[in-house]
Every structure is written in structure tokens, then in C-alpha cells.
Amino acid sequence: MIELDAINPNNLKILEVINEKCFDPEIIIFPTSFYKDTISVGPLAQYAYFNQVCVGAVRCKKETHNKSHKIQILSLAVLPAYRNRSIGTKLLEYACETAAEGKAKEIYIKLSPKLDVSEWFIHRGFIIDESSKTEDSVLLSKKL
């Protein structure tokens, strides 16, 4: 059974552990400020629990441009042993629902092509923004 729960000051360190286990430090390094700012984003950061074990997390941030809101996914990670159990999908659905409830018009993520996860997002309704594609990053977005 998959359950989601808030990230709070008492369990914040778990986010760091999940990210360290899921992301190659040569590709992605999260600065200390990323973790410090996590508590302030409220519902835009959640843990995923599988049978009461914390196995994943999503962390987003809200952006406002010309009175229009967008949500950027900064981290979406599931521990390798728990992948292919719809946990990542549940975290992504939660992020999209929370973004829509907050009146965001779009949700997006910038990825390193080295991560090789673009197809996962495309299968969940995201599209590649070809105009922002570089050799170091690809932007995928979904209208809400």
C-alpha cells in the first residue's frame, strides 16, 4: 500500500538520504539550501511510504510569471528497490493535483539527458520543449 505524507523538520534528513541513493552526484547535486527551503514549500514536498517504509519523495517549487503560476519539480525520486510499483506515478499525480489546486497552469521538470527518464514523463502526459533543449538539459512540461 502506498501512502503519502508531509516532509517536516523532524524527517527532513530522509529526503537527503533518498536523493543520495537515487541520483548520481556527478549528474545532480542538491545544495544545502534545497533542503533548508523544503519545509517552506508545504504541500509541494511529500514522502511516499510503501508498507509504512519511506521509499520516495517529490519536491517542487512554485514560480510566478506575469500573474501566472507554474510548478517546477526539483526532485522526484524512488529508491531503486521500490521502482516499478507505481510509487513514482503516485508522487507525480500528487504533484500535478497539488499544482492544479494552487491554480498553476503548468508543471515542468528540467532533466539531464544522462538520467534517461524523459520517456517515463512522456508516458504520463509531459511533452518535451524542443526550444529549450540543450546538451545539458531537457525541459518537459504538462499543462494543467
Curated annotation (Swiss-Prot):
Highest taxon, organism lineage: Eukaryota
One Gene Ontology biological process: mitotic sister chromatid cohesion
Enzyme nomenclature, EC number: 2.3.1.-
Keywords: Acyltransferase, Cytoplasm, Nucleus, Transferase
Coiled-coil ranges from the UniProt annotation: none
Enzyme class: transferase
Ranges of residues in domain N-acetyltransferase: 2-144
Disulfide topology: none
Acyltransferase is among the record's keywords: yes
Protein name per UniProt: Uncharacterized N-acetyltransferase C663.13c
